[in-house]
Amino acid sequence: MQTPKLAILLALAMAAAMVNLSQAQNSPQDYVSPHNAARSAVGVGAVSWSTKLQAFAQNYANQRINDCKLQHSGGPYGENIFWGSAGADWKASDAVNSWVSEKKDYDYGSNTCAAGKVCGHYTQVVWRASTSIGCARVVCNNNRGVFITCNYEPRGNIIGQKPY
């Protein structure tokens, strides 16, 4: 009798640990740290976590949970969005690193992206005037993947201005 109870308790403990690990890899600090590393690399000050922006991001991510569509919210904040395919445990750092990887395609001198490339996610990450971020992550329904969004205040990517 004791063995099945012990096995069930052990299984529940392992499941709880896995949930905590997943949440631990998507904490506010897991978003803030890679943002600040990228910003520090170009001499820009740190961003801090905003619960207001987090709530906005979570509300929008919840709206994308059924389709996981890479579509911007149209909200009043700067915004980066990320989609990861089903079957992988996409984390906060995966999204931020994806955006920061666009640095190689950004030319500061001309304030443009390389031909045929995207770099606006990177420039939003390092936008000097942006001082607060809030992010959210959802696992989309029907095996559609993971949707991650970060919002920025003040918003960046203002035409004609350099990010730093």
UniProtKB/Swiss-Prot annotation:
Q: Which GO terms describe its biological process?
A: defense response
Q: Disulfide bonds, which pairs?
A: C68-C140, C113-C119, C135-C150
Q: Which residues are modified to Pyrrolidone carboxylic acid?
A: Q25
Signal sequence extent: 1-24
Residues forming the SCP domain are 34-152
Protein function: Probably involved in the defense reaction of plants against pathogens.
Q: Return the PANTHER family for the record.
A: CYSTEINE-RICH SECRETORY PROTEIN-RELATED
The UniProt similarity line reads:
Belongs to the CRISP family.
Stated name of the protein: Pathogenesis-related protein 1
